[in-house]
Amino acid sequence: MDVAFDLVNYAYASRLRLLKEMRERDARRKLSKKEAQHHMAIVAAQNASRELEIAQQQRAGKEAQLYQELTSLNTLSSAALDHHHLHIERLAAEITIRGQVLDDARIAQEQAETAASEAKALLVKRSEARHKWQQIQDDLRRAVDILSEAAGEIEADDEILLRYGRGSLAQRSRNEFR
């Protein structure tokens, strides 16, 4: 009966369980970070959408203002018309830029969502591994306890048998197999 061998296995299982716990904590930290990045990406996409909407409203307002001026005045100077046209073009360019920012924000949001999902899957995998090694360690602990208890009982029985002069159980079992 090699109790030391079982203790080494228990110690090995314990170290592996600790390693798995460290990896699980690391995966939990990464998941937290990825979820925070995902949340920031959602907020950025919402802000970009809001800014695009504001730019579109400004352009629509400026176009309505120009239309009102055109309908209220029969004649509008060429310089004033060019000025309004230039302003509308700037607003259109801003809308294009805001649209691109929104597209980029949505792409970043999707990437962050994917990264968070992958981090969650990794955490689940690491948690399962840690749980498995915890069970193995618990099983080994029970086995070591049972072996230690059995060894203690055999030793106590041997002492009783030696006290009464009959020889130990270990010696008897060796003699029986010869």
From Swiss-Prot:
InterPro entries: Flag_assembly_chemotaxis_eff. Keywords: Plasmid. This is Uncharacterized protein ORF7. It comes from Rhizobium fredii. The lineage of its organism: Bacteria, Pseudomonadati, Pseudomonadota, Alphaproteobacteria, Hyphomicrobiales.
